[in-house]
């Protein structure tokens, strides 16, 4: 699948997807097992984020070929198309901040 500029922008439009992609530019980490734990001892917001990651954001990045995701091992690695989005990730304002929150000149 050839990714378009619109695809790249969609991939980084959400803060959770953007943070995942930025983390992969620094190294090829494993996704934290605790992040996908839905136990009642976790704050509701954390459980909601984990559910969103599992059911929305990670599948979207997989479909784009940007990541490889082993659900059983809760492991995320760079996908076959990852190198194509790296130039965009490199120029994001503040690198880890919201695009609209960055106040740099």
What residue spans do the PLM features occupy?
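Short alpha-helical segments that sit at the start of domains
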Residues: 1-27, 32
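Short acidic, hydrophobic short linear motifs in intrinsically disordered regions
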Residues: 30-46
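Residues in the recognition helix of alpha-helical DNA-binding motifs
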Residues: 57, 79
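A short, conserved structural fragment
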Residues: 58, 62-72
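Short, Lys/Arg-rich nucleic-acid/phosphate-binding segment
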Residues: 71-76, 82
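Short, amphipathic alpha-helical interaction segments positioned at domain boundaries
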Residues: 83-105
């Amino acid at each position: 699948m050839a990714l378009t500029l619109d695809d790249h922008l969609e991939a980084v439009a959400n803060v959770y997807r953007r943070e995942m992609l930025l983390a992969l530019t620094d190294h090829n980490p494993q996704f934290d097992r605790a992040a996908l734990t839905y136990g009642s001892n976790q704050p509701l917001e954390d459980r909601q984020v984990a559910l969103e990651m599992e059911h929305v954001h990670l599948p979207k990045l997989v479909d784009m070929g940007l990541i490889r995701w082993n659900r059983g091992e809760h492991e995320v690695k760079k996908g076959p198309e990852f190198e194509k989005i790296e130039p965009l990730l490199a120029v994001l304002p503040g690198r880890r901040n919201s695009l609209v929150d960055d106040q740099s000149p």
